[in-house]
């Protein structure tokens, strides 16, 4: 089975304060160990969003880059989508409903029968965005990326 894992810094393997351990601790490595007969394709990009447009680094928008990711890795049996945390940043004026629509857009694109006409449509697993806790307001960097609305929308998604 070929499993394409599309995600953000969590898929990329970000570990606070321990960048040297990034490659060995990311969840895709654990998945590969649990499924040694499968091919795990890691597509993690720090800062990647579902639909939010990052004006500084535009290639971080998932819906814009999804076609390239899908076409470059066919055939794929399963796509795991683990995105959404970055869409909750205050600069994007986050809304849980908008985030849910973005995930639906991802799913529709992956299920598009014209995407890869000679291959079957892959199964899809959506992993909920990482739940933001109150501590993020105190621990974030000087950019102040998350605010109270970010926390509210994260809680709404968790329900």
Describe every region a protein language model picked out.
Residues 60-159:
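Alpha-helical cap/lid subdomain in secreted, periplasmic
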Residues 1-46, 51-56, 69-71, 79, ...:
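Serine-esterase "nucleophile elbow" of acetyl-processing enzymes
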